[in-house]
Amino acid sequence: SSMALAALEHPNIKIKSGLVITKRNHLEVGLEKYTKTIKCLESDHPTPSLTSLECGADLIKFINSKQPDDEFLFLLSGGGSSLVENIVEGFSLEELMNLTDALLSRGYNINDINAIRKHFSQIKGGKLAGFLKNRKTTVLTISDVPFDDPKVIASGPLSHDDAKINLDNYEDDITDKIKSIRPISCPDISMFSNINTKIIAKLDDAKFACKSHGEKLNYETYLNENFIEGDVNSLANYFSEYLENCQKGLHIWGGESSVNLPEKPGRGGRNQQLALLMAEKIRNKDIVFLSAGTDGTDGPTNDAGGIVDGNTINKGNECKLDYKKFIKNADSGNYHEKTNSLVTTGPTGTNVMDLILAIKK
């Protein structure tokens, strides 16, 4: 919604009407001034809901109501895969919700998750382009995916994609569900001739901003180019070994980790879990470690992540907290709250994945 507000206030952009769909409680302050021009809808993330289907129907209705010579401006960012949906026939909302929860809880990466979403959708994977009927369209995108691929961002509703799902990437129950539904094909490449897509913000921008600020604070800064992904347990081992051998200063990474959740997880998200695992690794060391989502949310919580140091576990022990139980139960958020190591920023309005920062003194 922050993108919408910027477009509405830009002197060179003239918007006759618009539709804004964002996460609940994430509407940008200031949009209320434009209620005569735009309609604002709030939807659900990370698991789609009935509201997501209603927003999908509203989006298609909005496009279909426009004139043949009207031009479109789409502002896409992370979360669109869940916020807006129009599922294929023969696939129910309950099935979609259960499948999404299974994919998220088992640690699949965003590419594999969005490939599934495209399979069961009538708008993802370039299919929304069919509703535009070759009208001139500009797509401005904030990337929240590895390597900034427009086909993956918000599941690529306006990017041509005829790739097939690699069934070898999934467990049997998910593979069986994929085989049971015949997907709708992506429109012909000719339907994309009037669509111009540009990425206007990405993870590298946030990493370079951290580097610049660190230098202003007189830190020696080290910008790590490798993209951080994979299970948080493996990543904690990687960061621990790295920090054991690296130079003193500010070390910067970016990416998006994953967590395999127990049947009944507690409070937290991937960043909070990684931070708690690192609290154990850096115990009694002169290191500060932060992992946080740039959008201000981490998993199904209102917190961004966690920031820990060499004394975090000792604080927990003083409060008689067994950090191993909190890790096992994926309840890192409650541990961080009790040890004052929770990062809570509120919605930032921008999502370019996660930042991981470490200061070695």
Label for each model-derived stretch:
Residues 19-22, 74-78, 139-145, 154, ...:
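Short beta-strand segments
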Residues 23-68, 116:
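Glycine-rich oxoanion-binding loops at beta->alpha junctions
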Residues 21-25, 227-229, 257-303:
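Active-site catalytic microenvironments in core metabolic enzymes, especially phosphate/sugar-handling
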Residues 42-51, 104-132, 298-326:
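Proline/glycine-rich low-complexity loops and linkers
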Residues 3-32, 42:
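Active-site cofactor/substrate anionic-group-binding motifs, chiefly glycine-
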Residues 89-176:
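Internal gly/pro-rich beta-alpha loop/helix module
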Residues 132-138, 154, 159-235:
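Accessory alpha-helical/coil subdomains and C-terminal extensions
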